[in-house]
Regions:
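Conserved Rossmann-fold NAD(P)-dependent oxidoreductase catalytic core, especially the SDR/UDP-sugar
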Residues: 78-134, 149
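Alpha-helical substrate-binding/gating segment
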Residues: 170-180, 187-220
């Protein structure tokens, strides 16, 4: 197949290109050439900026277009309209499109709505990420119809992760000592290895799948994630009382059931997830990110407060 990747050199895009090349597909990358430009030297590279200059794509079509970073609806619409003669359009959205996580929604769950708010203004930062992604989905479906494949990942983890949101845990395990973690250990954490997601997406394109898919694992108990470590489990109420930041200060943690979704559809369509140890090893090579994760001092303070309360 002939595939066009919008981006394709950072995290998920990079993994998709690697998976596609491993399967013998022909790739073209369209990006600004500013991130990891040295990657994939034998792949055709078109330079431009999807917000202002799509001229390198004019008059061309591919078997599938893969859009990993669309966020502004008008920008996504322009690329979809220009590439409408391509076979299908694969848009990477997010489970953040759901209006709430009161239950683990399947793909028909309620999505967030911006109402009458001015989209252009709201797109200037990431505080409206979910609703804007939902609008981007609609733009793609409006142009490509049943040739659109909408992928809604949860937290993506693994090699080359630039966010630090999962990387904190393999790094923390490697450091050893007493580890603070959110109780109960039976609570599930949902995430997907970037390599598993990329391989599924490339295979889904080859199989001409369409429609919407929640794209994450069925879930791993926290106790399994931290198996073998010296863990002190503390309840949500304690973490909230001491203003521990969800998701970023204590990665993966959101009070209650967290960001869980129903993944029955993608599992039925052959999403394969590798062993946890392999995912942890892959993530361990990614760098820490400043401001993500508990500092050793903050963790020690919280552990001391917890033990004093429990004495």
């Amino acid at each position: 197949m002939r595939l066009l990747a919008l981006g394709g050199t950072k995290f998920l895009g990079r993994a998709i290109v690697e998976a596609a090349l491993a399967r013998g597909h022909e790739l073209t990358l369209f990006n600004r050439g500013e991130t990891n430009a040295e990657l994939f030297p034998d792949v055709e590279k078109l330079r431009g900026d999807r917000t202002s200059d799509l001229s390198a794509l004019e008059g061309r079509s591919w078997d599938a277009v893969i859009d990993v970073a669309g966020y502004v609806p008008a920008v996504v619409r322009r690329s979809a309209e220009l590439l409408r003669d391509s076979g299908r359009y694969v848009f990477v959205s997010s489970i953040s499109v759901y209006a709430n996580f009161d239950e683990p929604w399947d793909e028909s769950g309620p999505t967030a709505d911006l109402g009458d708010a001015p989209v252009d203004e709201l797109a200037k930062d990431y505080s409206n990420y979910g609703p804007l992604k939902a609008l981007c989905e609609a733009e793609v479906e409006g142009v490509f119809g049943d040739r659109a494949l909408i992928v809604r990942p949860g937290l993506i983890v693994g090699p080359h992760d630039p966010t630090g949101r999962f990387t904190y845990w393999p790094h923390r395990l490697a450091r050893g000592g007493e580890i603070l973690a959110p109780a109960p250990p039976e609570r599930l954490a949902q995430f997907v290895d970037v390599r598993d997601l990329a391989e599924w997406m490339v295979d889904a394109i080859a199989r001409e799948l369409s429609g919407v898919f929640n794209a994450t694992s069925e879930g791993i108990p926290w106790g399994e994630l931290l198996d073998g470590a010296n863990v002190t489990w503390v309840p949500d109420e304690f973490l909230q009382e001491h203003e521990v930041g969800e998701w970023m200060e204590l990665p993966l943690w959101i009070a209650g059931t967290g960001l869980r979704v129903d993944v029955g559809r993608i599992v039925a369509e052959r999403l394969r997830t590798r062993p946890l140890a392999e995912t942890l090893a892959g993530a361990a090579g990614a760098p820490d990110v400043e401001g993500v994760g508990l500092t050793p001092e903050r963790e020690a303070e919280l552990l001391s407060l917890w033990h004093a309360r429990s004495a």
